[in-house]
Amino acid sequence: MDLTKLTAHELKDMLSNKEVKAEEITKAFLDRINLVDNKLGAYLYVSEEEAIKKAKEIDVKIEKNEELKALSGIPVGIKDNINVKGMQNTCASKILEGYTSPYDAHVTEKIKQEEGIILGKLNMDEFAMGSSTENSAFKLAKNPWDLERVPGGSSGGSAVAVAGSEATLSLGTDTGGSVRQPASFCGVVGLKPTYGRISRSGVVAFGSTLDQVGPMGKDVEDCALLTSAIAGLDKKDFTTADKEVPDYKKSLTKDIKGKRIGIPKEFFGDGLDKNVRKSVEEAIKVLEANGAEVKPCSLPLMDYALSAYYIISSAEASSNLARFDGIRYGYRSKNFKDAKDIYLKSRSEGFGDEVKRRIMLGTYVLSAGYYDAYYKKALKVRKLIKDDFQRVFKEFDAIVSPTSPTTAFKVGEKKDDVMSMYLSDIYTVPISVAGVPAISLPCGMVDGLPVGLQIISDYFKEDVLFNLAYNYEQSVDFHKMRADF
């Protein structure tokens, strides 16, 4: 049996029944990483010794018949912008090359408390800015379904690790679609929770009012398992909500009778690949056949979401990335004349093109002459988009759409076409702007590549997402597909 192909809940059952040891599972994944990651590029750092040490500790507990925790013995990969004590945290940027984290992010602490085995740090677009993981300063991540195609981004390494069987579970971050879009491209399940459901403490900030940590897994149950483990109030992050975290496993029922689902016409317009549309429409029919009430709806302000997002996120990035100055840690230019020159050259040489593009855009829209015309107006548009979603959720329990307008595109295909790259997030960005939760799960294959179905719900209604996603998943077999790599 190939342990790397199994889900987290399958591995949990085997561990509980003493059919396998945690060390055996961990070594199987480390062997898999050593075998395939030179081609897939999911990992930027592998913590082999520490992972085996933790696995042995869990095996001792199992032998003593101690109660297992939620993630005991389950291999997890962590995106390289989420701090793990003693491991590198580079954000896939030259400017942080060699930086080792002195502390754990809140979500990392929670995984350790639940005895998950952290295998290492995962590849990403630099500072989480990108939709293909081609902006990593260190290596290219490739889609396990087709090595000539991108895995999506910015959490490309997180999706590749799960789809390529290099981790059972992974954590990514989602600012405008960076968990959902790579989940769609790689055929795994990825959740962007409600803003404030999961702590951002210890996560390197890109857009502080948009960033969210999101779990990825091979199926909906795995995703629910990891969400339950890491969600909840954190006093170090004042944006986290003081709301009880439900046991999301209880949401995993096949009963969706009477659930009201809206189909927004704006998500099915020009630019949507006809075969992706067909797969999503077939998925909607399955939900309807299973008892959901499906009706059309409209989100007329969606067309403004992408523009508002890039203004707001770039403005926040300009502020957040000002701390990387070449003085305190990270990359420092070797050729400089004075202190001002250190800042200028260290940042110019340390940041990649996409990061510099967004810093410049953000600085521009925050400047005295343009603040009202761009940034302030974008905030007003954001409020209207939130109101739009709230209006729809008074009538519907959830909204269903494609996750991305296409399947995974070829490496290099959009690298120099900035607008085309940005448009790959056109269906995920509005959800981030509104701050509501959404899940992506596989709903078909087009020319050997996965298609993602996006289900969106109201604030803190992740249980509705898991319920609908699980119902659909159990009616089809797409979650059982494994990339033959």
From Swiss-Prot:
Gene3D superfamilies: Amidase signature (AS) domain (3.90.1300.10). It catalyses: L-glutamyl-tRNA(Gln) + L-glutamine + ATP + H2O = L-glutaminyl-tRNA(Gln) + L-glutamate + ADP + phosphate + H(+). Pfam families: Amidase. The keyword Ligase applies. One of its GO terms (biological process) is translation. It comes from the Bacteria. The active site is at residues 79, 154, 178. It is an enzyme of class 6 (ligase). HAMAP family: GatA. Allows the formation of correctly charged Gln-tRNA(Gln) through the transamidation of misacylated Glu-tRNA(Gln) in organisms which lack glutaminyl-tRNA synthetase. The reaction takes place in the presence of glutamine and ATP through an activated gamma-phospho-Glu-tRNA(Gln). NCBIfam families: gatA. Heterotrimer of A, B and C subunits. This is Glutamyl-tRNA(Gln) amidotransferase subunit A. The gene is gatA.
